[in-house]
């Protein structure tokens, strides 16, 4: 489990928190004992977005990307292990990006989300890379331009997160997802992530031969042999 734990700054994306997040993701992806990565938070705020204190003091980089936030988002999406986000508090700006980047994101129905950047004189640039593919154009345009807050239930309707549940059910819902993921083979889970990320970028002409070769590699793996043998033996 990776926990955003800078409650004093509402888990805002400063240099330390962002670097720590990237390092934790890297370590978890490299640890053979880790099967699923859970991203959660301490306190009442999931992530307040950019650390404005650092920006105003001149200690923060002018672009989130230069302090590794883009790398963290990319690693969440392209890393071989599934990332499940558990969100029970506010997610603003970059916090929405973290929720959108996760493979499966579950929030409480009353959690607050918002693309509030325009009200600070900027725009949701880095997080647009992970948010826009999940949203319809008209809804994205309105959310980006108006900067209003919306609930976890509405975030699910927009496609930003997987689903929203009552607050009392959040832990059970997250655990149910984790239990399902643990039933999958580690290599198979990574392969499934890769398919979802890469196939939509290809033309059908390119996708079919690529997928056929990829499938052949998977079926030839030791993990597949073990999995199919277990299935046939009803293990």
Model-derived regions: residue spans:
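Conserved CoA-thioester-binding segment of acyl-CoA-metabolizing enzymes
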Residues: 1-42, 74
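Terminal peptide-recognition signature
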Residues: 2, 6, 20-21, 39, ...
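Charged catalytic carboxylate motif
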Residues: 16-20, 68, 75, 173, ...
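Glycine- (often His-adjacent) and acidic-residue-rich active-site loop
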Residues: 19, 33, 41-76, 91, ...
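Acidic-histidine catalytic/liganding microenvironments
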Residues: 31, 79-80, 234
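Crotonase-fold acyl-CoA enzyme core
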Residues: 74-186, 221, 226-229
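Helix-loop "lid/cap" segments that line or gate small-molecule binding pockets
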Residues: 143-144, 155, 195-199, 214-219
């Amino acid at each position: 489990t990776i926990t955003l734990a800078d409650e004093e700054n509402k888990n805002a994306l400063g240099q330390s928190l962002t670097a720590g997040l990237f390092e934790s993701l890297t370590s978890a992806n490299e640890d053979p004992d880790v099967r699923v990565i859970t991203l959660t938070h301490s306190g009442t705020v999931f992530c307040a977005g950019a650390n404005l204190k650092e920006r105003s003091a001149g200690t923060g980089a002018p672009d989130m990307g230069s302090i590794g936030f883009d790398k963290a988002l990319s690693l969440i999406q392209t890393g071989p292990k599934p990332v499940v986000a558990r969100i029970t508090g506010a997610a603003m700006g970059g916090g929405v990006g973290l929720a959108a980047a996760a493979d499966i994101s579950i929030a409480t129905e009353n959690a607050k989300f918002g693309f509030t950047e325009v009200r600070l004189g900027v725009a949701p640039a880095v997080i647009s890379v992970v948010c826009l593919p999940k949203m319809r154009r008209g809804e994205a345009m309105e959310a980006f331009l108006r900067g209003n807050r919306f609930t976890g239930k509405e975030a699910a309707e927009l496609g930003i997160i997987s689903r929203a549940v009552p607050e009392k059910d959040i832990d059970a819902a997250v655990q149910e997802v984790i239990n399902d993921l643990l039933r999958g083979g580690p290599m198979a889970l990574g392969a499934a992530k890769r398919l979802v990320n890469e196939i939509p970028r290809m033309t059908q002409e390119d996708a079919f031969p690529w997928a056929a070769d990829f499938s052949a590699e998977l079926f030839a793996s030791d993990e597949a042999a073990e999995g199919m043998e277990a299935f046939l033996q009803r293990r």
